[in-house]
């Protein structure tokens, strides 16, 4: 905690002093790319991904220790009947991750990705955002700090994902609080909300944003009022990655909402991040557009768990492999253009 005693102060200081890209590494990557055995631009976005890796790691593009970090939290707003599933499913899915039985486990095996799962006090749901703040400032800051531990032990590509019954309600409230519009524009089915459940979900988002409307101009305050533990932890992980020169792939609707908090605090806060995919959650494409990003994949997925980010990691690994492994024209004895 900072000397002033305010829990968010250290994070505000970090957000004011974000490191930028490594210009020399970027130039070196562009120069090598110009010598590879292909026409300029022939690998399309793969080339841009390689440059992005170089700029944010400060070295030639490589992915040797990719990691998927899943943050799991429970939410008091589920008491409003916003989801057909009970909150106990969150803990059950954490057990499924540990047993290797979830979709994310299979994708991690396929693409040789590490996996860490962070259980964020699942027995103690956050406050119901339609009635009170989700978290105290102290609890929110502590959870951000815990999320920063995602990169402890070393990784060179971090994929951010989540698990939490009720958290698409939270994501919709964050987006409505940040960007305005109507609740209907930001609320989608999540884990299968429809009919009366979907109506309750929309109403809950409206009530929550109305309750906290006088406190939403500060992004970190918005997060602690409308967010949740996995939101705070993901924000902390993304911020820590920036400070440690670790590129990040953001997953779906909920992870994007966490990222949006940081961008609202500093417009450059997500320059080291890619959006892995656009999900089937209706508000996600609008949220991505607000961030000024272009997703790598569009597969109609809306599972969460970091699955879209993990699939995108395979593309990022391929981009690095092409950049580092392809021969130059001189090495291959292939004639370059005149």
UniProtKB/Swiss-Prot annotation:
Its EC number is 2.4.2.21. It catalyses: 5,6-dimethylbenzimidazole + nicotinate beta-D-ribonucleotide = alpha-ribazole 5'-phosphate + nicotinate + H(+). The keyword Nucleus does not apply. Gene3D superfamilies: 1.10.1610.10, 3.40.50.10210. InterPro entries: Nict_dMeBzImd_PRibTrfase (IPR003200), Nict_dMeBzImd_PRibTrfase_bact (IPR017846), Nict_dMeBzImd_PRibTrfase_N (IPR023195), Nict_dMeBzImd_PRibTrfase_sf (IPR036087). Pathway: Nucleoside biosynthesis; alpha-ribazole biosynthesis; alpha-ribazole from 5,6-dimethylbenzimidazole: step 1/2. HAMAP family: CobT. This is Nicotinate-nucleotide--dimethylbenzimidazole phosphoribosyltransferase. It comes from Sinorhizobium fredii (strain NBRC 101917 / NGR234). The gene is cobT.
